[in-house]
């Protein structure tokens, strides 16, 4: 997106929808987060960033957005996305590492993710459902609520994994308010088959193209973007059809 706009990015908003099963392991991780010990809570938008970087950022402008909104660029409604609390933190860590390697996304770069739905009523139900689930996670009797969901080690059957899918639309914007839209689609359960494809692509990237990977001296634990760079994009195009437009 940054190369397409040929300028620093001011922000990127990602919108997702799909169909698939529920992972018992993911549910278990969610309920275990209350035991996570850190100086910052899981709700901190820069949870994975350094103290020095956090001091330079506007925390309030990067907080998770739980509002329902009609998005004119895609003609759909947005709602909170359950994986945004993880994905956005990783992207912000990538942004910091790229800054240190003189490959900045943009000095005022912001990133958010949402679900996209056809109807306001659907967006409202998703928002309400996530709110209830969030209350279950922090409840004193969360252990009892945990029993209502899929057990760790269990997940969707083969038919569900094969018939699942996801679609993502990313809208990048620069300081001149020029926009660029990127659409991705993948067949296969988002949390299983589609994720397995991405893991395999990363493995191939490391095994076959190590000489083309970014030579980064900053970051410690790297993200996909900072560790694999544009080399991984060429592999992703093989399995995830993409379409872009200004």
Where are these regions (language model features)?
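Short beta-strand elements
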Residues: 168-174, 184
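Short, hydrophobic alpha-helical segments
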Residues: 2, 98, 199-211
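Low-complexity, glycine/alanine/valine/leucine- and proline-rich hydrophobic stretches
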Residues: 185-202
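Glycine-rich phosphate/pyrophosphate-binding loops
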Residues: 207-223
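Short, highly charged C-terminal tails/helix-capping segments
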Residues: 218-234
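Conserved small/polar residues in nucleotide/adenosyl-binding loops
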Residues: 235-242
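Active-site-lining helix/loop region of Rossmann-like oxidoreductase modules
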Residues: 2-152, 156-164, 168, 180
